[in-house]
Structures are given as C-alpha cells and as structure tokens.
Amino acid sequence: MVKSQPILRYILRGIPAIAVAVLLSACSANNTAKNMHPETRAVGSETSSLQASQDEFENLVRNVDVKSRIMDQYADWKGVRYRLGGSTKKGIDCSGFVQRTFREQFGLELPRSTYEQQEMGKSVSRSNLRTGDLVLFRAGSTGRHVGIYIGNNQFVHASTSSGVIISSMNEPYWKKRYNEARRVLSRS
C-alpha cells in the first residue's frame, strides 16, 4: 500500500482537472437558434442597448477622471487664502483658481474674470450638473462668484472667508445666491 500512495495522489489530483475539462467543454457546445432559450437573444439584436451601456460606462470613467483631477488640484491648493486678483499660492481669487485648475488639469484656457468665464461653454440646468461644470453665484448687486462642481451638490472654490475650500450648494448662503452653471468640458 505504501508504494501505491504516490499513484493514488496523482489520480486524486487529476480528478478535479478532468471535472473542470468536462464542465468547460459543455460551455463550448454549439448554440444554434433552435436550441436557444426563448429569452436568449443574439448580441447583434441588442447593439443599441449595449452601446448605451458602453456610453454610460465611458461617461462614468470620464467623470471619475475629471473629479480626480479637480481633487488633485484642490489638495494642492486647499487652504490657500483668498486675494482679489490673486493667482498664486500667496493668495488667489475664485476666477483665478478656476482658470488655473482648467489650465493645469485639462489644458483648457479659460478667461481670467468671472464675468468672462460665465460666457464660456453652454448653459446647464442645475438638475443636469456634471463634475467639472462651472457653478456661478450672485454676490451683491454686481458681484459674481465661480466654483467648480464636483458632484453631490458640492463645489470647490476660493472663498473670501476661508480660501480654497469645498462647499455645499445646499448651504443657505449658496443656495440663495446660485445663478447658473456652464459646461466647458466636452465629454466626447
């Protein structure tokens, strides 16, 4: 019996391999139209829904990439104080932060002023906001404020009181002053 143990081990090791081979060969059996289940459809007939799923997946990946880039910029600038007209780490204003973010993270040149930035891209309703959209607010009778939407009703911006921060658009101050959103990043 001692001499037969190595042979028995080889046989026992081979049984799972044989079982897997048999199961896998069943997967490669010919599937003709007559032996398909009624609820099974050919892939070609679902091209449009598959394309829609692929488009949704690609949009999700792009949104994750856009948010990641914006958050990288935020991490680099978090807490930098506000300075009207500023565009450096010694102090930056809202439009300067937006301009630098889009230049450094997306290679996109936006104008320097909030007034000019609000004319860029296309108008987007609040219910259709996407990560990377510009969100614009009224501040006083002629003042304007701009930030970058990052999802979940949040935006990153250079605030006059706290410097570069993330704020909620649902905070009473911002909710009351929300004006519009602009889409400047293409998703193609």
Curated annotation (Swiss-Prot):
UniProt-listed InterPro entries: Murein_DD/LD_carboxypeptidase, NLP_P60_dom, Papain-like_cys_pep_sf
Active site: C94, H145, H157
Residue span(s) of domain NlpC/P60: 64-185
EC number in record: 3.4.-.-, 3.4.17.13
Gene that this polypeptide is encoded by: mepS
Consequence of gene disruption: Unable to grow on nutrient agar at 42 degrees Celsius. A triple mepS-mepH-mepM mutant is inviable, whereas a double mepS-mepM will grow on a nutrient-poor medium but not on a rich medium, suggesting the 3 endopeptidases are functionally redundant in vivo. Depletion experiments of the double or triple mutants lead to cell lysis, as well as significantly decreased incorporation of mDAP into peptidoglycan sacculi and increased amounts of the enzyme's substrate (Tetra-Tetra-anhydro muropeptide).
Recorded catalytic activity of this chain's protein: N-acetyl-D-glucosaminyl-N-acetylmuramoyl-L-alanyl-meso-2,6-diaminoheptanedioyl-D-alanine + H2O = N-acetyl-D-glucosaminyl-N-acetylmuramoyl-L-alanyl-meso-2,6-diaminoheptanedioate + D-alanine
GO BP annotations listed: capsule polysaccharide biosynthetic process; cell wall organization; peptidoglycan metabolic process; peptidoglycan turnover; proteolysis
Major subcellular site: membrane
Function: A murein DD-endopeptidase with specificity for D-Ala-meso-diaminopimelic acid (mDAP) cross-links. Its role is probably to cleave D-Ala-mDAP cross-links to allow insertion of new glycans and thus cell wall expansion. Functionally redundant with MepM and MepH. Also has weak LD-carboxypeptidase activity on L-mDAP-D-Ala peptide bonds. Partially suppresses a prc disruption mutant.
UniProt name for this protein: Murein DD-endopeptidase MepS/Murein LD-carboxypeptidase
Record keyword Membrane present: yes
Enzyme class: hydrolase
A single GO cellular-component term on record: cell outer membrane
Cell compartments where the protein resides: Cell outer membrane
Lipid-bearing positions (N-palmitoyl cysteine): C27
GO MF term list: cysteine-type peptidase activity; endopeptidase activity; muramoyltetrapeptide carboxypeptidase activity
SUPFAM superfamilies per UniProt: Cysteine proteinases
Keyword field: Cell outer membrane, Cell wall biogenesis/degradation, Hydrolase, Lipoprotein, Membrane, Palmitate, Protease, Signal, Thiol protease
Family: Belongs to the peptidase C40 family.
S-diacylglycerol cysteine-type lipidated residues: C27
Span of the signal peptide: 1-26
Protein's organism: Escherichia coli (strain K12)
Gene3D superfamilies membership: endopeptidase domain like (from Nostoc punctiforme)
Entry-linked NCBIfam families: PRK10838.1
Membrane topology note: Lipid-anchor
The protein's annotated pathway: Cell wall biogenesis; cell wall polysaccharide biosynthesis
